[in-house]
Amino acid sequence: MLDRLEGVEQRFLEVESLLSDPKIVGDQKVYQKYVREHADLSKVVEAYREYKQVLEGLEESKELLKDPDPDIKDLAKEEIDRLDKEQVRLEDELKILLLPKDPNDDKNVILEIRAGTGGDEAGLFAADLFRMYSRYAETRGWKVETLSEHLTGVGGIKEIAAMITGQGVYSAFKFESGTHRVQRVPVTEAQGRIHTSACTVAVLPEAEEVDIQIDPSEIRVDVYRSQGAGGQHVNTTDSAVRLTHLPTGVVVTCQDEKSQHKNKAKAMKVLRARLLDHAVQEQNASISAERKSQVGSGDRSERIRTYNYPQGRVTDHRIGLTLYKLESIMAGQISEIVDALTTHYNAEALQEGGL
């Protein structure tokens, strides 16, 4: 591990030097690439330098144990105890920092929520989930932009797609893909019986044009008039756009904007992300079940979480986490869940890597 850390520190110094090179500064695209690399490396280097100081401190304190003065010996023992704990903490931190980084972690995401079983109640729960994620994004300083939405007649959401932009968005949202189940008494239920409904969530990293090539001849473009929740036309021009990727059958619609051009641009963003996701899912399917992370599999059919309103309980089934904080979680305070999932995933990765 120490050899790897020395290599990281050397690369950090190289990048630091490159950032002061006038040629690099003059090319903003290249400059920004090195700025991002510098930021990533700095986390490892800071921890490594602190670790080296702790090792030096331990050596000095062990030397003081040879001192004839008993008071100095006692102080040295106390310092060794403290530094031993620091050494363990920093070694654990460095192991995680040295894990291979998910190349998508810093990407923006396209968040898709679809109402599943449960009729109108599933649509209302889909709207609740979207509010929860939107509020969480706001607390992190991220921007949420609706790309397309199909509303139900009772204030729910049949299907919604939104772009969430900011630093590290995918790293926080990537474990949210799957089936989310709700248990509660619907507002329409006169007998007070608890119903179970479900929604599926898909989190797709934003795909740049370089990530996936799409042949324009393989896309069928249909235009039509935008419709409201009840099916009525809300626009007098054919501004809504439906894109069909013929080889895969993936269909994307967008009708939120009044401009056909803007709707097509938004639909292309979603299509590109879905096609990249389609390729990744196919690749994951070829990986043996033993090697695929339970937390990070992103299986859409996997029931990942239950929100039980009568008990005020939220349970994440993948890691056995139960929190009796449903109200604050639905208000967007999901950091505790995100952190627990990340910790679990890191522990899995460390075990797999034999660290």
UniProtKB/Swiss-Prot annotation:
The keyword Protein biosynthesis applies. It is found in: Cytoplasm. NCBIfam families: prfA, PRK00591.1. GO terms for cellular component: cytoplasm. Residues 282-309 are annotated as: Disordered. This is Peptide chain release factor 1. It comes from the Bacteria. InterPro entries: PCRF, Pep_chain_release_fac_I, Pep_chain_release_fac_I_sf, Prokaryotic/Mito_RF, RF-1. Keywords: Cytoplasm, Methylation, Protein biosynthesis. SUPFAM superfamilies: Release factor. Gene3D superfamilies: 3.30.160.20, 3.30.70.1660, 6.10.140.1950. Its main location: cytoplasm. One of its GO terms (molecular function) is translation release factor activity, codon specific. Methylated by PrmC. Methylation increases the termination efficiency of RF1. Peptide chain release factor 1 directs the termination of translation in response to the peptide chain termination codons UAG and UAA. The modification N5-methylglutamine is found at Q232. The keyword ATP-binding does not apply. It holds the Pfam family RF-1. Residues 289-305 have a biased composition (Basic and acidic residues). Belongs to the prokaryotic/mitochondrial release factor family. SMART domains: PCRF.
